[in-house]
Amino acid sequence: MKIKDYAVDTARAVAFLSRIPMPQSLFKGYDGRLGRLVRAFPFAGIVIGFIPALALLLLLGLRADPLMAALIALSIQVLVTGALHEDGLADTADGIGGGKSREQSLLIMKDSRIGTYGAIALILSLAIRAAALAVIARHSSPLTAALAIPAVAALSRGAIAWHWQRLAPAKADGVAASTGQPDEAAMQFALASAGLVAALLIWPAFGLRPLVASLLATGIAGFAFTAFIRRKLAGHTGDTLGATQQICEIATLCALATAL
């Protein structure tokens, strides 16, 4: 693997997963397929998590209340991603919660309007993540707490690669189907790099037990949700990819906070 090619893949992945602008020259001749691109999702997560992590560091350094700092950091993260993953979580919650059959669930998920299940899922997602991040901030230095954001961002986006590769598209005409199925090698590289990033960021800052807890939480949450979606929808959609990221981020932050 060439470093230049991986750097280009990372930049394209950042553009796909966020609203961070990237040079148009990187997309010249690019067909939009994501089969290989998922290998760069964890490192794209680091880039995406940098700005909210910096905000958390500055706020905690100014002795802001940890919960307030966590909420502001997560709000900035939503702005950076354009609420891409939150939208997927809400649509998936509406579809699974309101649909009585696979077909009805998929139809509901196409509706751009948010329902009761989606609203509740969004509220709980933000509340639980903010609470967990606040716990981490209260028991850590500002720099250590800030490192949790890119670490969890990398792990949760590695989980997207797993979910995407392990399930066939639920809809032949869906957006996820049009971008292609991730390569097995790309998925494995994404998982390995996500674990490496977590080890480099979490172990020195928090210790071995929080690292193990974070890895287990991401793995269990990603595996369980993928199995659940396989049973409910018999395949992935763009929305379930976003929901995977959110669920794994929630689980990992909670595990990290509990293991301190």
UniProtKB/Swiss-Prot annotation:
Needed co-factor(s): Mg(2+)
Tagged with keyword Ribosomal protein: no
- For this entry, list what GO says about its biological process: cobalamin biosynthetic process
Q: Tell me, in one coarse class, where this protein mainly resides.
A: membrane
The reactions it catalyses are:
alpha-ribazole + adenosylcob(III)inamide-GDP = adenosylcob(III)alamin + GMP + H(+); alpha-ribazole 5'-phosphate + adenosylcob(III)inamide-GDP = adenosylcob(III)alamin 5'-phosphate + GMP + H(+)
Where does the record say this protein resides? Cell inner membrane
Membrane-crossing residues?
A: 40-60, 64-84, 117-137, 142-162, 188-208, 209-229
Q: Which Pfam families match?
A: CobS
Q: How does it sit in the membrane?
A: Multi-pass membrane protein
Q: EC annotation? A: 2.7.8.26
- Provide the alphabetized UniProt keywords: Cell inner membrane, Cell membrane, Cobalamin biosynthesis, Magnesium, Membrane, Transferase, Transmembrane, Transmembrane helix
Q: Superkingdom of the source?
A: Bacteria
Q: Which GO terms describe its cellular component?
A: plasma membrane
Quick one: which pathway?
Cofactor biosynthesis; adenosylcobalamin biosynthesis; adenosylcobalamin from cob(II)yrinate a,c-diamide: step 7/7
Signal peptide per UniProt:
none
Top-level EC class as recorded in UniProt: transferase
Q: What is this protein called?
A: Adenosylcobinamide-GDP ribazoletransferase
